[in-house]
């Protein structure tokens, strides 16, 4: 039994090559069936994200799997091979556990990868490319990722601006589910902020953008309300949290607009997070009572502190993946021992059946009973001791005392 992990990721390849080896959702079902057909066990899972494409197989040949990947995407070996990494046995299991735990991610400890690995596993089950070993490998991996999350602080500290902004909001408001949020801008950073807010239970979001169409497109995913920048004064008084990130050269929110909104809110506190450069919110807003303004510099200082915290947590997480991958391989070896015992017994029974049938035929033809039994015993003995005798001979000729000692123990030659 041989577990193999072959992949390419953000550390080894450019985005251009990663795009070429990626598998689209509508094709991954058939791709996994095709890959599984190249393994002896029919087991394969493909994990394909923007940052990585990885193939996990049981009883597959490394060179054959790489050839399949290149053929599937129509790529030249010399273009792909230098960017590939591969792991076998326990190293393959540990790599999967590290990936699912966020230890191999671009942002250390990011939680999204676990969901992506789970989704890949579900698709593999739907494709019928999962059997006992791969199933157990992935189920154990999900348990390990959960263990890493609960027993370390790997995911507790924010290490991206978007995540840090939402984490700050969580510290100030006891529950985000009842807060009203105004997002200004509709770019990638604000979209990521919206995702983190949704994951934390925020149900009421308004997205303000210069072009309404872009805001509407983003709002569909998050069930939010889209408005233009000109409508901000009407919605600002309702906002408990304001997070802004636009490319505007001039501030979007001035001190006067925020002051007016706070009066309408009867001086309920408002958190404002400005993650734009240049700034979207006038710095004088921080002088207002009940307005709590944080800039991207404030967030970066938090992020740097948290990176150090995550590195400490990562060291603990690495120990967990090492221990758990070792335990998994012990289970795999127990399966192999059961298979070996079954195969050895089956082989011995086949020899016995063959020789007994030959002896019965001779008896039926009038052969001497004593002679037939002696011949049966001799033939059976010779056949059964043939392989052990060969192994002992080879070990003796090579002076391999370790193997010789193990063989003597297995064959019971050292018993008194």
Swiss-Prot record:
The active site is at 50 (nucleophile). The keyword Lipid metabolism does not apply. Its EC number is 1.2.1.70. Pathway: Porphyrin-containing compound metabolism; protoporphyrin-IX biosynthesis; 5-aminolevulinate from L-glutamyl-tRNA(Glu): step 1/2. It comes from the Bacteria. Coiled coil: none annotated. Keywords: NADP, Oxidoreductase, Porphyrin biosynthesis. Homodimer. This is Glutamyl-tRNA reductase.
């Amino acid at each position: 039994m041989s577990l193999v992990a072959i992949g390419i990721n953000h550390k080894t390849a450019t985005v251009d090559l990663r795009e070429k080896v990626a598998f689209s959702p509508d094709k991954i079902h058939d791709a996994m069936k095709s890959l599984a057909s190249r393994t002896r066990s029919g087991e394969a899972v493909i994990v394909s994200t923007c940052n990585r494409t990885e193939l996990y197989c049981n009883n597959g040949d490394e060179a054959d799997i790489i050839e399949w990947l290149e053929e599937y995407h129509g790529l030249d070996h010399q273009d792909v091979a230098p960017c590939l990494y591969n792991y076998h046995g326990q190293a393959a299991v540990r790599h999967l556990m590290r990936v699912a735990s966020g230890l191999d991610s671009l942002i250390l400890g990011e939680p999204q990868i676990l969901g992506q690995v789970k989704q890949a596993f579900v698709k593999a089950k739907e494709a019928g490319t999962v059997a006992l070993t791969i199933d157990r490998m992935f189920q154990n991996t999900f348990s390990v990722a959960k263990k890493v999350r609960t027993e370390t602080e790997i995911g507790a500290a924010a290490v991206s601006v978007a995540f840090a902004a939402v984490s700050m909001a969580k510290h100030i408001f006891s529950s985000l589910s009842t807060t009203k949020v105004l997002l200004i801008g509709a770019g990638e950073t604000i979209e990521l902020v919206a995702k983190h807010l949704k994951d934390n239970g925020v149900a009421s979001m308004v997205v303000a953008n210069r072009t309404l169409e872009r805001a509407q497109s983003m709002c569909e995913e998050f069930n939010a309300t889209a408005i233009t920048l000109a409508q901000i004064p009407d919605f600002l008084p309702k906002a408990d949290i304001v997070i802004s990130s636009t490319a505007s050269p001039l501030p979007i929110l001035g001190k006067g607009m925020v002051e007016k909104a706070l009066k309408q809110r009867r001086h309920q506190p408002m958190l404002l997070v400005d993650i734009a450069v240049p700034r979207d919110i006038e710095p004088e807003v921080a002088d207002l009572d009940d307005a709590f303004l944080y800039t991207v510099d404030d967030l970066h200082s938090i992020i740097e502190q948290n990176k150090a915290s995550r590195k400490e947590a990562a060291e603990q997480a690495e120990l967990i993946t090492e221990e758990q991958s070792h335990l998994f391989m012990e289970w795999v070896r127990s399966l192999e021992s059961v298979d070996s015992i079954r195969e050895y017994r089956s082989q011995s029974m086949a020899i016995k059946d063959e020789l007994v049938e030959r002896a019965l035929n001779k008896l039926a033809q009038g052969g001497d009973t004593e002679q037939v039994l002696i011949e049966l015993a001799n033939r059976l003995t010779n056949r059964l001791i043939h392989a052990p005798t060969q192994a002992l001979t080879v070990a003796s000729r090579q002076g391999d005392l370790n193997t010789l000692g193990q063989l003597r123990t297995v064959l019971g030659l050292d018993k008194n």
